[in-house]
Regions:
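Ubiquitin-like/PB1-type beta-grasp interaction modules and other compact soluble beta-rich domains
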Residues: 1-88
Length: 89
């Protein structure tokens, strides 16, 4: 039997300062099986030191639900929203 590795495609949407440092409003990640939200963030942080600094301060939504545990597993085709701190009214 062959070992089949299935990638986990995840959509990422960046907002405000996160979008600015990412240089794009959205990105697609291909993560390994069993990938967690922390793995997705680590993949994004690897793109630049600047984005890594911003992502440390962000909150995250996964399919519209606030992320409380970065160790939560991602399923294929989920959407991760990256929300930096907002100010104003």
């Amino acid at each position: 039997m062959t070992d089949v590795t299935i990638a986990v495609p995840v959509s990422v949407r960046f907002f405000a300062a996160a979008q600015h440092v990412a240089g794009t409003p959205a990105a697609e990640l291909m993560l390994g099986p069993g990938a967690t939200i922390a793995d997705a963030i680590a993949e994004l942080c690897g793109q630049s030191d600047e984005i890594a600094l911003v992502l440390q301060k962000c909150s995250y939504l996964c399919d519209g639900v606030a992320v409380r545990d970065l160790r939560a597993s991602l399923r294929p085709h989920q959407t991760l929203d990256v929300l930096p701190p907002f100010a104003g009214g």
